[in-house]
Amino acid sequence: MPGNTKKSADSGLTAKDYYFDSYSHWGIHEEMLKDDVRTLSYRDAIMQNPHLFRDKIVLDVGCGTGILSMFCARAGAKHVYGVDMSEIIHKAVQIVEVNKLSDRITLIQGKMEEIQLPVEKVDIIVSEWMGYFLLYESMLDTVLVARDRYLAPDGLLFPDRAQIQLAAIEDADYKSEKIGFWDDVYGFDFSPIKKDVWKEPLVDTVDRIAVNTNSCVILDLDLKTVKKEDLAFSSPFEITATRNDFVHAFLAWFDIEFSACHKPIKFSTGPFSRYTHWKQTVFYTHKDLTVKAGEYIRGTITCKPAEGNHRELDIDISYTFNPREPNREPVSEDLSYRMC
């Protein structure tokens, strides 16, 4: 490749490597770059803190089009190394060149786990590693490899904190459309498909008015200390109904923080915040609940990488609802989902 660029010996793509190949297409990068919440949060965290980046060596894990690398260079970084497996890196090289930053940005094509940086340690790692439900198709395990191998003892991660939140929602119309649809498909019974539809979480934007409980943190990550095995987790939860309503699903989203900044910068992908391309994740229950304000739904959510594809997720939710009045029946379910 022209310019200040390197390519690892083992970086050739294969037809089977769909995940990395999907990031070679322009559409996904356009969607991410146009996500103002995402991109401006990174820009502000980096460029409003030049005192942290000045004369520092920075590693950009999964650099994509190079936007974060260029933010770092503009913030005063001595040199930025961007690593990406996808073929998009060829265009990133040209983008860096036309922005006259080739003298301070080196792009390397390859897997982070396999490449060798030309430096022993870096001062800062930046990465936009998050996926749906935070962990679906995420690169966090790759960021942790980079952290353990290259980050200086007093180094910084951007971002460095992440949380997943869980709440419940009323969603009768869409649940009927998504699940009930299979009972009568142009006069035919397609119900054998329903059990598979139940298992697939829906990634979509949910109106804030649908949320009818408080939220509960089910995962809280400090990227400076978290280990790969921590990404498979089991967490109890308790959420409280905020009004008399029906519950048709659980809703999850994540929040991100850059706490190393002079003024910490945060953003949320939840229904009470501005739209992001991550949207929210809906887990429909088999049973519908009738709740009254102040009543609790208690349970446990378990998440682990799927066997055979660690970027997919197996998620189990077990919950119990005990109404206050004895004439109302308790409800409990054990639900299993696959994000794929």
UniProtKB/Swiss-Prot annotation:
<dbReference type="GO" id="GO:0006355">
    <property type="term" value="P:regulation of DNA-templated transcription"/>
</dbReference>
<dbReference type="GO" id="GO:0006338">
    <property type="term" value="P:chromatin remodeling"/>
</dbReference>
<keyword id="KW-0489">Methyltransferase</keyword>
<dbReference type="GO" id="GO:0035241">
    <property type="term" value="F:protein-arginine omega-N monomethyltransferase activity"/>
</dbReference>
<feature type="binding site">
    <location>
        <position position="29"/>
    </location>
    <ligand>
        <name>S-adenosyl-L-methionine</name>
    </ligand>
</feature>
<dbReference type="InterPro" id="IPR025799">
    <property type="entry name" value="Arg_MeTrfase"/>
</dbReference>
<dbReference type="InterPro" id="IPR029063">
    <property type="entry name" value="SAM-dependent_MTases_sf"/>
</dbReference>
<dbReference type="GO" id="GO:0035242">
    <property type="term" value="F:protein-arginine omega-N asymmetric methyltransferase activity"/>
</dbReference>
<feature type="active site">
    <location>
        <position position="128"/>
    </location>
</feature>
<feature type="modified residue" description="Phosphoserine">
    <location>
        <position position="176"/>
    </location>
</feature>
<dbReference type="Pfam" id="PF13649">
    <property type="entry name" value="Methyltransf_25"/>
</dbReference>
<comment type="similarity">
    <text>Belongs to the class I-like SAM-binding methyltransferase superfamily. Protein arginine N-methyltransferase family.</text>
</comment>
<dbReference type="GO" id="GO:0032259">
    <property type="term" value="P:methylation"/>
</dbReference>
<feature type="modified residue" description="Phosphotyrosine">
    <location>
        <position position="19"/>
    </location>
</feature>
<dbReference type="GO" id="GO:0005829">
    <property type="term" value="C:cytosol"/>
</dbReference>
<keyword id="KW-0539">Nucleus</keyword>
<keyword id="KW-0949">S-adenosyl-L-methionine</keyword>
<dbReference type="GO" id="GO:0042054">
    <property type="term" value="F:histone methyltransferase activity"/>
</dbReference>
<keyword id="KW-0808">Transferase</keyword>
<feature type="binding site">
    <location>
        <position position="113"/>
    </location>
    <ligand>
        <name>S-adenosyl-L-methionine</name>
    </ligand>
</feature>
<protein>
    <recommendedName>
        <fullName>Protein arginine N-methyltransferase 1</fullName>
        <ecNumber>2.1.1.319</ecNumber>
    </recommendedName>
</protein>
<feature type="active site">
    <location>
        <position position="137"/>
    </location>
</feature>
<keyword id="KW-0597">Phosphoprotein</keyword>
<dbReference type="InterPro" id="IPR055135">
    <property type="entry name" value="PRMT_dom"/>
</dbReference>
<feature type="binding site">
    <location>
        <position position="84"/>
    </location>
    <ligand>
        <name>S-adenosyl-L-methionine</name>
    </ligand>
</feature>
<dbReference type="Pfam" id="PF22528">
    <property type="entry name" value="PRMT_C"/>
</dbReference>
<dbReference type="GO" id="GO:0016274">
    <property type="term" value="F:protein-arginine N-methyltransferase activity"/>
</dbReference>
<comment type="subunit">
    <text>Interacts with pab2.</text>
</comment>
<dbReference type="GO" id="GO:0005634">
    <property type="term" value="C:nucleus"/>
</dbReference>
<feature type="binding site">
    <location>
        <position position="62"/>
    </location>
    <ligand>
        <name>S-adenosyl-L-methionine</name>
    </ligand>
</feature>
<feature type="domain" description="SAM-dependent MTase PRMT-type">
    <location>
        <begin position="16"/>
        <end position="311"/>
    </location>
</feature>
<comment type="function">
    <text>S-adenosyl-L-methionine-dependent protein-arginine N-methyltransferase that catalyzes both the mono- and asymmetric (type I) dimethylation of the guanidino nitrogens of arginine residues in target proteins. Asymmetrically dimethylates the polyadenylate-binding protein pab2, modulating pab2 oligomerization.</text>
</comment>
<feature type="binding site">
    <location>
        <position position="38"/>
    </location>
    <ligand>
        <name>S-adenosyl-L-methionine</name>
    </ligand>
</feature>
<dbReference type="InterPro" id="IPR041698">
    <property type="entry name" value="Methyltransf_25"/>
</dbReference>
